[in-house]
From Swiss-Prot:
Keywords associated with the record: Disulfide bond, Glycoprotein, Secreted, Signal
Signal peptide (from-to): 1-26
Stated name of the protein: Inactive ribonuclease-like protein 9
The gene coding this protein: RNASE9
Gene3D superfamilies from the UniProt entry: Ribonuclease A-like domain
Organism: Symphalangus syndactylus
Pfam family, one: RnaseA
Function, in words: Does not exhibit any ribonuclease activity.
Length: 204
């Protein structure tokens, strides 16, 4: 039977065999869907993280607004706040749960202005951070279960304190923009003081 097929239809069978023996090739994914700008950027970021093997893109203004800033709604002291918001905002790193995360109840312009405040030591004491001048309400999320999405489980902690952030220069905007939220330090735990030159210092 096989010999008969090869004799009668040699060319189609050879072409089919050639296609089957070719290595699998991934085609470029068309992302030109009818999305809003926020959703389009979020979808492109998802595809980049899924296919990329290198470092992720630096955060943009829209990414910071989407992942960090929150509006009044669910009570900030709700026990499930982090589990709800982290899933809703797709907060993860290369499909793995983030070890910790901060949500801040403030406007983006207020957060960006912190980039121009004085430097203070970061939480780990290694880098320099910028500190907010006033107290900010927010939620600290700490990973308690699982390492891969969507099984991430977090413990939620309401905080009202000083925000410590790192900032990065963005060429497109020609401005410093928030890069990471390093800590949200409550005054009662802060034991802060000003050094002789007026710089805010966090004791070890």
């Amino acid at each position: 039977m096989m010999r008969t097929l090869i004799t009668i239809h040699p060319l189609p069978l050879l072409l089919l065999l050639q296609q089957l023996l070719q290595p699998v090739q991934f085609q470029e994914v068309d992302t030109d869907f009818d999305f809003s700008e926020d959703k389009k950027e979020e979808f492109e970021e998802y595809l980049e993280q899924f296919f990329s093997t290198g470092p992720t893109r630096p955060p943009t203004k829209e990414k910071v607004k989407r992942r960090v800033l929150i509006e009044p709604g669910m009570p900030l002291n709700h026990i499930e706040y982090c589990n709800h918001e982290i899933m809703g905002k797709n907060v993860y790193y290369k499909h793995r749960c983030v070890a910790e995360h901060y949500f801040l109840l403030m406007q983006y312009d207020e957060l960006q202005n912190i980039c121009y405040n004085r430097f203070v030591p970061c939480k780990n004491g290694i880098r320099k951070c910028n500190r907010s001048k006033g107290l900010v309400e927010g939620v600290y999320c700490n990973l308690t279960e699982a390492f891969e999405i969507p099984a991430c489980k977090y413990e939620s902690f309401y905080r009202k304190g000083y925000v410590l952030i790192t900032c990065a220069w963005q060429n497109e905007l020609q401005k410093l923009i928030p890069h990471t939220i390093n800590d949200l330090v409550e005054p009662s735990e802060h034991r802060s003081f000003l050094s002789e030159d007026g710089v805010f210092v966090i004791p070890p």
